[in-house]
Structure formats: C-alpha cells, structure tokens
Amino acid sequence: MTSTPSWQAQARRLLVELLPPFAVACAILPFVIAHGKPWPWQPSTIDLQVYVYAVKDMLAGKDIFATTTPFWNLYFIYPPIAAVLMTPLAFGPYLMWQLVWTAGLIWAQQSVLRRCGVPRGWKLGLVGVAVVLAVEPIRTTLGYGQVNTLLMAFVVADLLPDAEGERRRLPQGVLTGLATVIKLTPGLFVVFFFLIGKKRAAL
C-alpha cells in the first residue's frame, strides 16, 4: 500500500482550509456593501474598483491621485508604489479580479489564523468561515475589496513564526516594509521593531 504523495495531501489540506471560507465570502459579498447584486453576482467591491481605475490611469500616463471612480467618486490615496505593485489589475475582466482578490484575502486571513495557532485542516477551514461571518472588519474588508487583510498577513508573518516551524524565507522586516510601501499604517510596526530592540528588522 502506497502513501499519498505529499503534494496531493497538501493540495487537499489547502482545499479544506481555503474553499469553505472563500465560498461563504462569495455568497455574502453582494450583501455586505450597498448596491451589490446576488445574481448576476456583482458585489460592490468599491476599493478594488479604485485600484483598477488608478492602475489603468497610471498606464495611460494620467495623474493617479486625480482618478475617480464612477458612481462612488472615490480617489486613490495610497503611495505611488502601491499602484505599480497593483499593475496586473489593469488586465483581464473585473469579475475575474473580484474573485482573485477575494481568494487572496481569504488566503491572507487563513495564514494569520494558522500563525496564531489554529490547527491546520478542517478546523482552520471552519474557523475561517466563522471569521468571515462574525468579524466585522474582515467582512467589510472583503466587501469593499480592500487590501487590509493582506497587509495584516505580511506583518503577522514578520512577527510570528510559522506554527509548523517553517523556515523564514525573508529577513525579518522585509514584509512589514512591503506592507508599508503599499499603505502607510503598517509603518507603525517599524516603530515597534525599534522599541523591542530589533533595529535591523526596522531598517
């Protein structure tokens, strides 16, 4: 009797961990923010729309800080490097990016839960579903299509070791720096690194 190849076991585990919260997120997204539609599926991912319009204007040589979105009339308020990092959003249908963005936020959420000690496998999947349904900041981040959960995952990955003892691939501080160039708020953790004596990570 042969054992299941490790990559197959890992794929099944990821499916159990990610698919339930992703499916629940997709189901509730049209109802989180006003003017969403359950069918055809059209959530009001307002912030994601801002990112897409800003990137398209950047590639067209326009001022991204003058970019506004239709109906909501919102502006891009992130550092310019954030628009550069979001360049792929200019290509492909918006519906595709709504799904990809939601999947990315769910992956980030599950990564944080795992590093905070939630057991892997179906328990992580169920906790992820509960977080999507019950934790308002996570739910609205998904509904607006914001970047906050991804930035949180970067910072947490810098601060907390992997629960399974996975070796750190990047020097401590790199992911916090990346989060800070996308949105300035995570820069507070640079100060935190200084305060706990990790000056190298802060720099």
Where are each of the predicted segments found?
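Short acidic/glycine- and proline-prone juxtamembrane loop motifs at membrane-interface regions
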Residues: T140-N148
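Membrane-interface transmembrane helices that cradle and orient dolichyl/undecaprenyl
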Residues: L150, V155-L170
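Perimembrane helix-loop-helix junctions
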Residues: T2-S6, G187-L203
